[in-house]
Amino acid sequence: MKMDCFSPRSAVAVAALLALLFAGCETKKQASQPGGSQYGKATSTASEGSGEAGTGAVSTASSAKEKFGSVSFTGQVKVTGAPPAPVELDTSAKPECGKQRQAFEQGTLSAENLVVGADGGLKDCIVFISKGLKGYKAKDMVTYGHPAKVVIDQKGCQYIPHVFAVMADQEVVIKNSDPFLHNVSIPSLGFNLSMPSVGEENRARFFNRKTGSQVCQCSVHPWMNAYAYVVKNPFFSKTGGDGKFTINKLPDADGTYTVEVWHEKDRKLKAPKAQKITVKDGAVVEGNIVFEFTYKG
């Protein structure tokens, strides 16, 4: 039987063909692996800032830094003059209140409308950035160290807290910790919620119609009141018993902002003027900020 044999020239041609096929498979294998493409190295380099993609990454980081900064400033709100000491409130007309306060170990109830510390520090002021910052929403509150929800409790015939700040559209939880009737009335908003016993209610988009101060009242217990101050951004602070405050996370970029202070007794206190602060090189130029009310009697 006759058999065909390869010529040397045919063998060379077959070897060349096999080499081409093998090279093609290797190229395909590399392209299927992360970073194995012939463009993989260029893409990685760009993400590190050497190309167009890198420029985009730097820009995004810069934008985030603008919004979520690290600048903070401190200060104090003080009172000059001779403000009176807080008076004890008479709750004898509602004996259930005294019993409930004993049960909660709250002690006697004193007026909270003008509480001044030993060195003149004024409690329960809202200090806030009024100009220079825009575009913040209620969802940003947690990012800036504030609670996602504001809680108002009716406990021992007293609103707790007495003063609070809230952003428009922020969720509010209204609680009644007492086993008897209370109500939360906010005349400026046309709002009135009766709560006959222990319980709570969530109210979304509660303070969504007005900015500034809103008084909360209980018509059952007329001495009960609290104040909400509706702010436009999360850059605010409430003063403690020493009148001191801290506002955190201002943008790192250079800028100028207006700072104001609010207190419920503005009618008997000559309010201080707004102040401007300047951020430069990641710090507040003015340092510690002092607001000074004057008590008029």
Question: Can you name each region flagged by the protein language model?
Answer:
Residues C25-G297:
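Extracytoplasmic copper-binding redox domains, predominantly the cupredoxin/blue-copper superfamily
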Residues A13-L21:
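Bacterial N-terminal signal peptides
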Residues D4, A23-G24:
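Coiled-coil-like amphipathic alpha-helices with heptad-repeat character
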Residues K2-A13:
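Bacterial N-terminal signal peptides that target proteins for export
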